[in-house]
């Protein structure tokens, strides 16, 4: 039975035994030292939500996301999406609005404090709500350019009316 992305993440949280949690979509490839870079960032910035640099799998020179932001209308978006990767976002670890659910690293104690993912969202934008709750509880989110993944994107859904519905419904 497909219980949706947030509930699947919550099941993983319930079974996780470690001090840290990493959420990974099933349609990506992690690159060398991706996890080490998260621990380096955590040591420097402390308890927070962290996301890597994400390049498209089909075009390794195209950005999939380099930090998720919230625009003036309150909608979340992936900064840099579709831009050529020319190193513009490679210089520093930067504070962002919220970490992408494609790949997110965080201490489990944050989840214990802010709660699990909202399963009513089913798919898409669940990390916006999660990141917002983290921020309201004093936790920041950071983009870590030294941590790199290649993301296929839409491996399970492609484009469909249901995907469009979920994307639009969950934006509000």
PLM regions: where:
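Glycine-rich, basic loop-to-helix element that forms the pyrophosphate-binding segment
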Residues: 1-16, 26
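Hydrophobic/aromatic residue at the end of a short beta strand that borders the catalytic acidic motif
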Residues: 5, 24, 28-34, 56, ...
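Conserved donor sugar-nucleotide recognition element shared by glycan-biosynthetic enzymes
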Residues: 5, 9, 34, 102, ...
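Short aromatic/hydrophobic "clamp" motif used to bind/position activated sugar donors
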Residues: 21
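Conserved donor NDP-sugar-binding/catalytic core segment of glycosyltransferases
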Residues: 28-75
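A short, conserved alpha-helix in the catalytic core of glycosyltransferases
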Residues: 38, 97-148
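A recurrent flexible, glycine/aromatic-enriched loop bordering the glycosyltransferase active site
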Residues: 63, 75-77, 83-106, 123, ...
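Active-site-adjacent helix/loop segment of glycosyltransferases
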Residues: 136-172
